[in-house]
Swiss-Prot record:
Coiled-coil annotated residue ranges, if any: none
Name of the protein this chain belongs to: Photosystem I assembly protein Ycf3
Source species: Sorghum bicolor
CC annotations in GO: chloroplast thylakoid membrane
InterPro entries given in the database record: PSI_Ycf3_assembly (IPR022818), TPR-like_helical_dom_sf (IPR011990), TPR_rpt (IPR019734), Ycf3/AcsC/BcsC/TPR_MFPF (IPR051685)
Listed GO biological process terms: photosystem I assembly
Length: 172
């Protein structure tokens, strides 16, 4: 069973108390309550940057097993992708971002993170002297950034600038 993590931070404490009260009064199944508990505990650990990603992943994996709502699952899968990104496990991260987007195609942050990974891989290919592979990665990054920007036009200004500079997208 996950342990509740409430530190001395007033906002964290308040959020945890409110979440626990809502969990008790909102009509939900026991499986949904358990999924939320695992999700909340995983999210709290991640947000507090305790560095215990293995435990956070265990909570998120358990939450995905218990959570049936596709929208809620999308955020759990997205957060798993974040941990894999932080750990430098880019292939796994991409897999979880894809899975999140299958359930919720309106996650611009997932598209952005996928673009960042592809852009990084393009830069790595350049360092290895493979410009053809680099261009393929950069093109893929551009496609993901276009999707993120389409969902939230006022965001991702650096990505928009990169797309303009590299002539991968024209903005009005």
């Amino acid at each position: 069973m996950p342990r509740s993590r409430i530190n001395g931070n007033f906002i964290d404490k308040t959020s945890s108390i409110v979440a626990n009260i809502l969990l008790q009064i909102i009509p939900t199944t026991s499986g949904e309550k358990r999924a939320f508990t695992y999700y909340r505990d995983g999210a709290i650990m991640l947000a507090q940057s305790e560095g215990n990603y293995a435990e956070a992943l265990q909570n998120y994996y358990e939450a995905t097993r218990l959570e049936i709502d596709p929208y809620d699952r999308s955020y759990i899968l997205y957060n798993i992708g974040l941990i894999h990104t932080s750990n430098g496990e880019h292939t796994k991260a991409l897999e979880y971002y894809f899975r999140a987007l299958e359930r919720n195609p309106f996650l611009p942050q997932a598209f952005n993170n996928m673009a960042v990974i592809c852009h990084y891989r393009g830069e790595q290919a350049i360092l290895q002297g493979d410009s053809e592979i680099a261009e393929a990665w950069f093109d893929q990054a551009a496609e993901y950034w276009k999707q993120a920007i389409a969902l939230t036009p006022g965001n991702y200004i650096e990505a928009q600038n990169w797309l303009k500079i590299t002539k991968r997208f024209e903005f009005e």
